[in-house]
Amino acid sequence: MEGQLNLDCERFQQITQMAKMGWWESDVKNQQYICSDFIVDLLGLESHRISFQEFHHRIREDHRTRLRNEFISHSNLETYEQMFPIQAKNGEIWVYSKISFRKPDKEGYRDIFGYLQYVDKPAEN
């Protein structure tokens, strides 16, 4: 059983590397995101935590208001998907993020988790 679990974990890591994606979860109480190694490396972070404010400021300015408004209007749904440009360690990149909302805890905080995936720049319409 333990051998199969290790094999599954290795396969999952290989697949996420191939897909250029990593996981994250929110710490609403402390206003931070906790990020996987992939996201830490992609964004050039110094630790596995980034404040909501710092992450928001990395999003290209012409997308910030739209994303904030969509997030607020969709926060009562179970999942939410978005694509946006963000400042990474090697310049601006495009990412796709899928979010899943958790039920509020005893203190009323509603943490979220999801994944962030590097994508080629979308075609201009």
Regions inferred by a protein language model and the residue ranges of each:
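PAS-family sensory domains
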Residues: 26, 85-93, 103-104
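PAS/Per-ARNT-Sim sensory domains
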Residues: 50-72
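PAS-associated C-terminal cap
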Residues: 1-10, 117-125
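PAS/PAS-like sensory domains
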Residues: 16-22, 73-83
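PAS-family sensory domain signal
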Residues: 4-56, 94-100
